[in-house]
C-alpha cells in the first residue's frame, strides 16, 4: 500500500480536529504487480472529526493485478463511536492512469462515515478494467454533497460513474 497523508485512530472524544490543508500530494505509486488488494491513496483519514480543504492530489497509480486493488485521492473511514461530521471542501483531485485497480477518487468506505462534501473539483480519466467513480459512498455512510464538479472519463472494460451509491 502507498499513501501520501495518513491519519489513523484519531481520538475525537477530546474534541481535537484533524486538519489537512493546502497540500500538494502527487506521484503516489504502488509498483507491486501482485494479485492483491493493494491501495494507492492520496489522503487517508480514519475519523469524522476532520477538515480537508484546499488540497491538490494527482499522479496516483497502482500496478496491482487484482480487481480488488484501489486508487483513491481521498479515502474516508471512521469508528462506530465517532458522532462528528467531517468537512471536505475546495479540493482538486485528479486521477489519470491505466490500471486494473478500482478508481474511486473520493471513497467513503465505512457505514459510520459522515461528511459534508462541498465545492471540490474531481477528475478521473485513463483506463481501468473495473468500474470507476469520482465519488463512491458505501451503503450506510452519510454525505451532504453540494456544488462539486465530478467528471469521470475513464475508459476500458468497466463503466465510468460520477457517483456510486452502494445499497443494502
Where are these regions (language model features)?
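Extracellular beta-strand/beta-solenoid scaffold signature
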Residues: 1-12, 33-44, 66-80, 99-109, ...
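Right-handed parallel beta-helix
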Residues: 1, 15-31, 48-63, 72-77, ...
Amino acid at each position: 500500500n502507498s499513501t501520501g497523508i495518513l491519519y489513523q485512530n484519531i481520538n475525537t472524544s477530546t474534541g481535537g480536529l484533524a486538519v489537512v490543508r493546502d497540500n500538494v500530494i502527487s506521484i503516489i505509486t504502488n509498483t507491486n504487480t501482485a494479485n492483491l488488494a493493494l491501495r494507492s491513496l492520496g489522503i487517508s483519514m480514519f475519523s469524522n472529526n476532520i477538515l480537508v480543504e484546499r488540497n491538490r492530489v494527482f499522479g496516483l497509480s497502482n500496478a496491482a493485478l487484482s480487481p480488488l486493488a484501489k486508487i483513491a485521492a481521498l479515502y474516508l473511514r471512521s469508528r462506530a463511536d465517532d458522532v462528528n461530521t467531517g468537512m471536505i471542501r475546495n479540493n482538486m483531485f485528479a486521477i489519470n492512469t491505466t490500471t486494473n485497480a478500482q478508481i474511486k477518487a473520493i471513497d467513503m468506505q465505512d457505514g459510520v462515515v459522515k461528511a459534508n462534501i462541498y465545492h471540490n473539483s474531481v477528475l478521473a480519466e485513463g483506463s481501468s478494467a473495473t468500474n470507476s467513480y469520482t465519488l463512491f459512498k458505501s451503503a450506510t455512510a452519510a454525505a451532504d454533497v453540494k456544488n462539486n464538479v465530478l467528471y469521470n472519463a475513464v475508459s476500458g472494460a468497466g463503466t465510468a460513474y460520477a457517483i456510486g451509491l452502494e445499497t443494502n
